[in-house]
C-alpha cells in the first residue's frame, strides 16, 4: 500500500514537471520505489545476518580459558587456535569428559580422557585446509588408537550436540574420539546456502579418515560412527548420494545415527526407493525406541544405520 501511494505521488510529480500523463510514469516509479524498498530490506537483513555471524566470535566467561587437556583441540598442544574454534567449538572441546569424571560417575577406575577434535570455519580458509587440520589433530591426539571415532556434521552455527557425544564417552569409558568441522556461523534455517559446502567438507573428511584407516591393520582401526541432527543429518548423508548403502562399507563406516533428517535429504529417499547397491536390511527409520525393540532379534542385529524421526 505504501509503495503504491509513493509510486502514484512520484508519477504525478513527473507528469507535472516533465510532461505526459501520470499513468505513463507509473511503471517506472513502481520499479524504482519497489527496488529501493527491496534494497532497504536486503540491507537491513544483511546487517542482521552480520550480527548473528559475529556472535560466532563471542567469548563466554565459562569458555574463555584454553582447555588444559592435550586431548582436545584448542589446547596449548593443539595446532588449532582456540580463538578460531568459534562459540560452539569452544563449548564443545571444553566440555570433553575426563577420565576422572567418568570414573566418579560410574564408580570405577581406569577411564581415559575422551578426545574431542574440532576445527572452526575460521581455522582455515578452504575445505582442504580445514580437513587437513582435522586429520593432523586426530593423529596428534591419538584418536585413531581409540576404539570408537564419532564423526559429526554440525548444525548451521557449528553446534555439535555434546549430549549424545558425552553419553558415548561414558559408555566407552573414555576410549573414544569425536571430530567435527564447522562450515558456517548462522542458524540452520539461514544456512541452506551452505549445504553444498557442508556436504563437500563432510565427504572430504570421511575420505581423509578412510585413507588413514587404510594404513592401519584392521585390528587396530577404530569403529567409525556418524552422528548428525537436523541440517547436520542432511549434510552428513549428502556425502553418500548416489552411493546406496555400499558407499558406507567403502568408507568403513560401522554405524550411524541421524536424528530429524529434513525431507529435503536426497540420500534417505534413495534408500527408501530401493535399487542397486542398496541393502534394505542394514538401515531403519524409527519414531521411537519401542519400534526398534519390537522388531525380531535378527532384524535388530542387522541394522547398523538409524534414521530417528
What is each model feature region?
Residues 156, 232, 262-263:
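Catalytic metal-binding/acid-base residues of hydrolase active sites
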Residues 1-148:
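Flexible, membrane-associating and regulatory peripheral segments of lipid-active enzymes
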Residues 105-126, 130-135, 139-221:
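Active-site catalytic motif of lipid deacylating hydrolases and related acyltransferases
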Residues 226-233:
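Gly/Ala-rich beta-loop-alpha elbow adjacent to hydrolase catalytic centers
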Residues 15, 43-56, 160, 185-221, ...:
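Surface cap/lid and interfacial helix-loop subdomains adjacent to catalytic sites
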Residues 150-152, 177-180, 225, 255-258, ...:
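Structural recognition of the beta-strand scaffold that forms the well-ordered cores
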